[in-house]
Amino acid sequence: MQPPPRKVKVTQELRNIQGEQMTKLQAKHQAECDLLEDMRTFSQKKAAIEREYAQGIQKLASQYLKRDWPGIKTDDRNDYRSMYPVWKSFLEGTMQVAQSRINICENYKNFISEPARAVRSLKEQQLKRCVDQLTKIQTELQETVKDLVKGKKKYFETEQMAHAVREKADIEAKSKLSLFQSRISLQKASVKLKARRSECNTKATHARNDYLLTLAAANAHQDRYYQTDLVNIMKALDGNVYDHLKDYLIAFSRTELETCQAIQNTFQFLLENSSKVVRDYNLQLFLQENAVFHKPQPFQFQPCDSDTSRQLESETGTTEEHSLNKEARKWATRVAREHKNIVHQQRVLNELECHGVALSEQSRAELEQKIDEARESIRKAEIIKLKAEARLDLLKQIGVSVDTWLKSAMNQVMEELENERWARPPAVTSNGTLHSLNADAEREEGEEFEDNMDVFDDSSSSPSGTLRNYPLTCKVVYSYKASQPDELTIEEHEVLEVIEDGDMEDWVKARNKVGQVGYVPEKYLQFPTSNSLLSMLQSLAALDSRSHTSSNSTEAELVSGSLNGDASVCFVKALYDYEGQTDDELSFPEGAIIRILNKENQDDDGFWEGEFSGRIGVFPSVLVEELSASENGDTPWTREIQISPSPKPHTSLPPLPLYDQPPSSPYPSPDKRSSQFFPRSPSANENSLHAESPGFSQASRQTPDTSYGKLRPVRAAPPPPTQNHRRTTEKMEDVEITLV
């Protein structure tokens, strides 16, 4: 059990409560004074900072306002399409905002700092008066409580005495008469005891009444103390301090809002005017003031004194006409070749821009350098192409058949670009070099070729050739499901590469995008309209046959080496990007095809040795997955021969159309009967497996032949689905097939 609470005297308890009240009121007063002081000092320091900042801004803006900018005239100061007036307006607006901040510093001093000091001084004086008055009121209440305690004490004493007399009287009344007491003595004692009891009861009643009256008075006094006197003291102590604090807080917020409003009004106006600044108007002003940038007069022909001619001249059947035709052929070829260079460099530029963010600063710098080189190559090619087109335009004005040469050259370039789409695209190698960044070398080689091509006299040849030059890209019009092992299943809208004609009519051999080869119906395909220059090569049959013999022998060696040495070749596909940590490790992107050279090593640390993009190194085997036999190109029906160490990735570029009209020439064709042609290089053979252009190398592609065990179809091709099956069933013929 806990001991009963200790009884404290009422007067002592009252003094403790009143002392605590006095302490709390003084603490409240001190907190309010501290708040006033904080507001006062904060406003002073903020005003000083604002003033210093505003003066610094004014000094900064004034320095720039002293400069004389070009293009600012007195009558053009409100023309905000020029950047110089807007800039000057911005500086002037900054000066105005800085001046408004200085004015705000005065508001801090006038509305917060000085009034807060006066309010605090007044509050200190009010505290002293309130403390004296509260002490007096508390003393009066203490006296009242003391009287209450005295009345209570007197009441307890008289009541206890009366209680004792009453008990004694009751005892006497109940006691029996003894043998030695007389009745008279007993009566006297009883009368005396009753008189004393009556007197004690009267005193007790009087003391009780006094105590109750004093208690009522003390309670009334206490109620007034808490309800009136103490409230008045606290009200007097507070005074108007809360009104002043509210005014100061409002002044802080209003001042900031006025500052923000002034800044917003100024810079909103400047923002609207800044949006009117346009480059074209500023450039126009600059050009008006600087006549040196005006386009000069075109260069004029300055004839010799004895020369009376002012333009190109052509005489029918003369050497000059032949020379002009050769010039037209030369520059048409140059236009086509530069168009091809632009396409190549644009492809390289797109690949470089999609390369992603380089990890190191050095790699980033190298990547930016490659991008700049590609853009520079495009710029040079465009200039050369423009100059060649200007020459062709002048030749066309005198009747030279420019369009014929340009159309033939562009068709040849379009064929080459279309065939190159199936080759390995240009890519960045491990050492940062680019396979296709050789436009300058190609251009130099082309110029040397143009200088030497005058030895061929082919001005009477014709560009009207309709023979197909395989390999050729085509589009599937109707789906077809293979019914024989040597046929190929195709889907509608699929893009195929036709390799060669079939032995039977209406059949061709084609390769799909995954490398599968087989025979498909020719009428199920849509071939591009090609105006190639195959007929031009007929005049170079001797040179072509020599080049063809050399190229065939080289390809035979490559095929033999592939069959004998790469029978167990294995490829894997990268599942993630990997950056080599050392010089002997191989780096590759996600989806890369890597040729495996060795899976076993002495450490057995999970690293394989492989080749990617011409570089050999080791890499973690957990980052790749092995390709199946069909993916490796080793299906039993096709026996594809893989010469490149990695399969050609699928390019997302759309098929390039073959031009029926020159894409960049605005000239209409004058007369196609008088067309003349430009011969291809003797190294380009119409039956070659490679589609190469001067200075541009692409991956080699081998065409499967019947010598490797493929059976050519000896059956009629099915008609397209849109045609009626009007053909009758043809009799199967026995054909003797000889495997070589």
UniProtKB/Swiss-Prot annotation:
UniProt domain comment: The F-BAR domain has an atypical, flat shape and binds preferentially to flat membranes. Upon heterologous expression, the isolated F-BAR domain is localized at the cell membrane, and causes the formation of cellular protrusions. Recruited to clathrin-coated pits via SH3 domain 2.
Organism annotation: Mus musculus (Mouse)
GO MF annotation terms: phosphatidylinositol-3,4,5-trisphosphate binding; phosphatidylinositol-3,4-bisphosphate binding
GO cellular component: anchoring junction; clathrin-coated pit; cytoplasm; plasma membrane; stereocilium shaft
Main localization, broad class: cytoplasm
Modification(s) after translation: Phosphorylated. Phosphorylation on a Ser residue is important for recruitment to the cell membrane and for its role in promoting endocytosis.
Gene: Fchsd2
Renumbered residue ranges of the record's region Required and sufficient for location at clathrin-coated pits: 567-629
GO terms classed as biological process: clathrin-dependent endocytosis; membrane organization; positive regulation of actin filament polymerization; positive regulation of Arp2/3 complex-mediated actin nucleation; protein transport
SUPFAM superfamilies named among the record's database cross-references: BAR/IMD domain-like, SH3-domain
Stretches with biased composition (Polar residues): 629-645, 675-706
Name this protein carries in UniProt: F-BAR and double SH3 domains protein 2
Keyword tags: Cell junction, Cell membrane, Cell projection, Coated pit, Coiled coil, Cytoplasm, Endocytosis, Lipid-binding, Membrane, Phosphoprotein, Protein transport, Repeat, SH3 domain, Transport
Biological classification of the source: Eukaryota, Metazoa, Chordata, Craniata, Vertebrata
Record's bilayer topology term: Peripheral membrane protein
Tissue specificity annotation: Detected in inner ear vestibula and in stereocilia in cochlear hair cell bundles (at protein level). Ubiquitous. Detected in testis, liver, brain cortex, cerebellum, kidney, organ of Corti, utricle, spiral ganglion, tongue and eye.
Entry coiled-coil feature ranges: 356-397
Protein task: Adapter protein that plays a role in endocytosis via clathrin-coated pits. Contributes to the internalization of cell surface receptors, such as integrin ITGB1 and transferrin receptor. Promotes endocytosis of EGFR in cancer cells, and thereby contributes to the down-regulation of EGFR signaling. Recruited to clathrin-coated pits during a mid-to-late stage of assembly, where it is required for normal progress from U-shaped intermediate stage pits to terminal, omega-shaped pits. Binds to membranes enriched in phosphatidylinositol 3,4-bisphosphate or phosphatidylinositol 3,4,5-trisphosphate.
Annotated localization: Cytoplasm; Cell junction; Membrane, Clathrin-coated pit; Cell membrane
Keyword flag Protein transport: yes
PANTHER family: F-BAR AND DOUBLE SH3 DOMAINS PROTEIN 2, FCH AND DOUBLE SH3 DOMAINS PROTEIN
Residue span of region Disordered: 303-323, 629-740
Limits of the F-BAR domain: 8-282
Assembly notes: Homodimer. Interacts (via SH3 domain 2) with ITSN1 (via SH3 domain 4). Recruited to clathrin-coated pits during a mid-to-late stage of assembly via interaction with ITSN1. Interacts (via SH3 domain 1) with WASL. Interacts with WAS. Interacts with CASK and MAGI1. CASK inhibits interaction with MAGI1.
